[in-house]
């Protein structure tokens, strides 16, 4: 229960947006969202971020948790400031900790809403020709959901990245129609 508490959510995706907005609805005293990149590089829906801001969520951009503060319970976080460096293998600018830049944030509850890096999908599926996006998800035709390999289709998180289950359900229905057409 977030009521009357200082909430800090770590992450920048749709799950983080669900957490911050739920905390607001539960009447949290304050809600902060820490993200290691800037707003333009946040993976979550821009609409969700805008809605969260309108509802009173404070975004702490270019920040990364360093350590939890508290005795027998969390009382806050020590946070490092981040600067964006050169692009990494995915093409996104790599977050780099700024030396001696830490600051503290008060928190009664800390929620980690962090995603995971995708695996090397071409290697995992034994097909080095399988195309992926700069995010590491499978690249598909927008209309048919077919990959660059004829007869190989994909749907859900493997093409979107971590997302909501309703999108996976929609994708599953759409790709079933495409597969049926392909087989006929």
Region spans (language model):
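A conserved FAD-binding loop/helix module that cradles the flavin
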Residues: 19, 155-184
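A structured beta-alpha segment of the ubiquitous adenosine-cofactor-binding alpha/beta core
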Residues: 62-108
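Rossmann-like NAD(P)H-binding beta-loop-alpha module
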Residues: 1-28
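FAD-site-proximal beta/loop scaffold in flavoenzymes
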Residues: 1-4, 88-162
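Rossmann-like dinucleotide-binding cores of NAD(P)H-dependent redox enzymes
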Residues: 20-67
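Cofactor-binding loop segments of dinucleotide-utilizing enzymes, especially the Rossmann-like FAD-
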Residues: 12, 35-38, 116, 157
């Amino acid at each position: 229960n977030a009521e009357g508490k200082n909430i800090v959510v770590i992450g920048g995706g749709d799950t983080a947006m669900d957490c911050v907005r739920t905390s607001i609805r539960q009447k949290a005293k304050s809600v902060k969202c820490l993200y290691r990149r800037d707003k333009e590089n946040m993976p979550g829906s821009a609409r969700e971020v805008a809605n969260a801001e309108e509802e009173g969520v404070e975004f702490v951009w270019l920040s990364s948790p360093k350590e939890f503060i508290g005795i027998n319970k969390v009382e806050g976080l020590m946070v490092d400031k981040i600067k964006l460096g050169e692009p990494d293998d995915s093409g996104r600018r790599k977050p780099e900790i700024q030396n001696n830049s830490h600051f503290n944030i008060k928190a009664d509850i800390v929620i980690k809403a962090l995603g995971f890096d995708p695996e090397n999908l071409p290697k995992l599926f034994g097909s080095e020709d399988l195309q992926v996006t700069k995010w590491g998800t499978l690249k598909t035709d927008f209309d048919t959901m077919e990959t660059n390999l004829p007869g190989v289709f994909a749907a859900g998180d493997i093409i979107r990245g971590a997302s909501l289950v309703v999108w996976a359900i929609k994708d599953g229905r759409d790709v079933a129609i495409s597969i049926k057409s392909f087989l006929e």
